[in-house]
C-alpha cells in the first residue's frame, strides 16, 4: 500500500555512517499533514485520501474551502493533494500524518518542480555538442540542421532553444537515510528536484527493487 507526505525542501548536507562512509543527503521538512477527506468507491467512485499541508490565513480562503477543512477541525491549507492505493482503515478525517510513516531504509519516489532557467539554447537545454571554437569556424553554439528539405517545414518536437526548467519531475527509488520525528525532518539519499523551500511530495516507490 502507498504511504505519502508533503514537505518542503530545506537543502543538502552530508552524513557519515558507522563504517565511515560519507552519504550526501537532501533534508526535507515535513510538518504534520492533516487528512481532510477520505474518499470511497461508494461516494466518490474511487479510494483515496486527501491531505492538506501548510496553514494559510483564513482571509485567503473562500467559504467552501473553510467549510471543507472545518470537518477536519483544522485551518485552511495552502497545498492539498490526494494519495491513492492506501489502506483506508488506517485514516480518518482530522488525523495527522507525520514523518514517522517512513522509516530508515524505505525506498521512495520524490516529486518536485525543477528550477526555472529561463530561455536557453539547445546546448544547455538538451545537452547537444557545440561546434569548433577555433578561428575560421562559423558554427559554434547553433542548433544545427532543422531537418530535411523535402517536407519544407520543421518537424514537431525538434530540439531547439526555448524555456528550460519549471517542470514537474519525479525521481524514483531513493533511499530514506534517517527520520527525525522531533524536528519533522526526513533525510533522503542523493539530490531531489526543486529549489530550496519548494513543495516536495514523498510517497512509497512504485517500482521498488
Swiss-Prot record:
InterPro entries: Ribosomal_uL3, Ribosomal_uL3_bac/org-type, Ribosomal_uL3_CS, Transl_B-barrel_sf. SUPFAM superfamilies: Translation proteins. It holds the Pfam family Ribosomal_L3. GO terms for biological process: translation. One of its GO terms (cellular component) is cytosolic large ribosomal subunit. GO terms for molecular function: rRNA binding; structural constituent of ribosome. Keywords: Ribonucleoprotein, Ribosomal protein, RNA-binding, rRNA-binding. Part of the 50S ribosomal subunit. Forms a cluster with proteins L14 and L19. Belongs to the universal ribosomal protein uL3 family. One of the primary rRNA binding proteins, it binds directly near the 3'-end of the 23S rRNA, where it nucleates assembly of the 50S subunit. This is Large ribosomal subunit protein uL3. It comes from Enterococcus faecalis (strain ATCC 700802 / V583).
